[in-house]
């Protein structure tokens, strides 16, 4: 039966998780906190997508941090492991407390005085919406173009002005580049969430032709709750929309859904259908490459992937080093394996020294 792993200091045990199976990431996290009586427990868990065998289900930490790529959540759920809960209570021993404290203060001063700190504090990675759109690198309508006409409506600045409640940092991190949002929209009552980061934000807006910010944020929240790789989900949906646009897929094959770009009702329905492998979502839950191999009809040529891993939200025609990254990275299209800041900066010396100052310009 399902279990979760509970680690408290050096005591490790497997606990019954049958009552957690079928719950989403947020529900699971809060249930574990309640069961163990400690809200400071760090929880890494899977959602319903992993339980249902969605091939790109991830592991979500503390409800919002996603180890999402390559389906590790799916693998975890296949072992009947619902979550890993960790709590450390013992002090960390330091050989030289005085020097250690001095180094912390020195690093804190450098961080807080850095030009990048202020923009990270305000916008986090969502600052990239405006930056990438400006240079033609924002994945739009399944990479048909690199600029989105509604970028200003779905930017980090738009989130800050409309929905931001307060900033926050990840566990033990000095830089509070994340944020709590309260989305006041009659369609999504009581929608409160952390984030988003650039990848899911762009994935559920420009990539699928959606200029409705609140809708995009709702999709990000659902993707996290179900425990899915937002890059993969947005690729599956945008691939299907382009196939529909080109006449490769019909409305009947998509459960009667209108796959026109930016159709909010369709987008929300597909996120649910994929997570629960229902109808057309069962096909997409195999990933865009797998879905295309099953559909055929030339749809294989439309899939944006490398080695089966869906391409992230940056158009390599604008940032060409990303094309090299996508080609040679061991697991495919992976923005975590290469960050070609020299191409943003135009500084050929980048990569031969600390690039923090260059990154701060963007």
Please place each PLM-identified region on the residue numbering.
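Long, structured ligand/cofactor-binding scaffold of large enzymes
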Residues: 1-19, 23
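Extended C-terminal regions of large enzymes
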Residues: 33-36, 40-70, 76-362
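Active-site-proximal gating segment of KS-fold condensing enzymes and close homologs
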Residues: 25-29
């Amino acid at each position: 039966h399902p279990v979760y792993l509970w680690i408290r200091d050096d005591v490790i045990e497997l606990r019954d998780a049958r009552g957690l199976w079928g719950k989403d990431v947020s529900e699971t996290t809060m249930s574990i906190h309640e069961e163990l009586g400690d809200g400071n427990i760090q929880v890494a868990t899977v959602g319903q997508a992993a339980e249902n065998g969605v091939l790109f289900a991830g592991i979500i930490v503390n409800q919002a941090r996603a180890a999402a790529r390559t389906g590790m959540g799916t693998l975890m759920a296949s072992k009947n492991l619902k979550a890993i809960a960790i709590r450390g209570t013992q002090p960390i021993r330091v050989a030289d407390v005085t020097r250690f404290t001095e180094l912390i203060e020195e690093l804190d001063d450098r961080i807080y005085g850095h030009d990048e700190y202020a923009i990270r504090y305000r916008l986090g990675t969502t600052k990239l919406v405006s930056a990438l759109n400006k240079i033609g690198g924002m994945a739009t309508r399944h990479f048909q173009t690199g600029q989105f006409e509604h970028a200003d409506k779905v930017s980090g600045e738009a989130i800050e002005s409309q929905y931001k409640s307060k900033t926050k940092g990840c566990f033990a991190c000095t830089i509070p580049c994340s944020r709590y949002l309260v989305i006041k929209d009659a369609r999504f009552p009581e929608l409160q969430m952390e984030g988003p980061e650039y990848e899911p934000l762009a994935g559920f807006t420009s990539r699928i032709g959606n200029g409705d910010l609140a809708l995009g944020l709702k999709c990000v929240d659902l993707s996290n709750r179900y425990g899915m790789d937002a890059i993969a989900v947005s690729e599956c949906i945008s691939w299907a929309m382009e196939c529909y646009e080109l006449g490769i897929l019909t409305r009947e094959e998509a459960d009667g859904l209108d796959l026109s770009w930016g159709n909010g009702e369709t987008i929300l329905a597909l996120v649910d259908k994929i997570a629960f492998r229902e109808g057309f979502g069962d096909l997409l839950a195999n990933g865009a490459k797998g879905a295309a191999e099953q559909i055929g009809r030339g749809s294989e040529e439309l899939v944006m992937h490398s080695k089966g891993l869906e391409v992230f939200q940056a158009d390599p025609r604008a940032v060409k080093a990303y094309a090299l990254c996508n080609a040679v990275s061991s697991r495919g299209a992976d923005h975590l394996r290469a960050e070609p800041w020299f191409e943003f900066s135009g500084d050929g010396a980048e990569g031969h020294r600390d690039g923090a100052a260059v990154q701060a310009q963007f």
